[in-house]
Amino acid sequence: MRSISRTTFARAYLAITFFSVSAGIAAEPVALRVESFTVLPSTGPLAFVEVENRQPDPYRGMIALKPPEGWRIVPAEREVVLAEKETKRISFAIELGRNAALNSYAVEVTATAGDTKVVRQQNVACASAPYFKPTIDGNPDEWKDAIGVRFTEGGKRTELRTYWNRRSFSLLVAVEEDTLIGQRRSGAFDGVQLAISPADSRTATSPDKVADRYEFLLAWTGQGTAGKCFRLAAPETQLATTQNNRDLSSLQYDDATVAVTRTDGVTYYECSIPFKPMRDRIRPSEGREFFLSVLVHDPDGTGIRDWGKTAGLWPWQRNRLAWSKWPGAKWGKQPPYDNKLHWGLCASKY
């Protein structure tokens, strides 16, 4: 489906926006974030709001979620009680929802405590993988029935599409960029870095702890459609180890299948990763939730594009230990965001 870059992919993405009656997010008593939906809104899923107490005192307030026009969510509001620095997930049931062609849903969440009100506006996506086994050959035609998740960084668009079956998890990343730099022995090169984690995992903040993720790097070899996959981390990998620039040849993961193509200024990374090594922690089944995040490396263009930023993670959720270093990466001044973004496995997008 070469039209991904011409039609749906080429449409403008509505950026996440913020609004608050307070002076700024650092001064607000609570921080708010609406998580991505993990199944399509038309199927009546739960919508989750993360609320973090940012003050040194307990917080008690009411949380209200305003959905897109024409939707119905219950209850209208929920009470939340938070201890100092505590974070909770508040759920709302979508009784009536409609799927959007662009997979972008404008929502507004409000926290009210007495005369103090905090409001955040977001555009959230449905982040879910339908059941299907694509052929990994560099041709994106089979991905039209996947759910596209789109974001823009530095004026360049990125689109993520995912599938799953009992044996593998598949990913297509369409990257709008000026040039594609293949893997080389020295100097920076392009790539896609992804982290997959169980839904109950948390990223540690100390290098003496161990990883709780399966982390991979996809890169073009520089020849034809050939791509490579490197496994940068697995559960129990020492986080201190992930912060070293290790020789990629020792990390090559031949159990994954990768193809890389480029058409009309868009690079397509297509990959299939076996579930077998992950099955004990992430069992493939309809309705399963897990964490998935992606970094796009475009060293001669936009730099790093971080799905965590677009998904609305808070500024203090940047975590250098959430992502492995590797030779050829060109990191920015700030560390990337955490890799714990909700994703789901569903039956179909229809």
Report the location of each language-model feature:
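Short acidic, flexible loop segments centered on an aromatic residue
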Residues: 54-70
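Bacterial N-terminal signal peptides
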Residues: 11-22
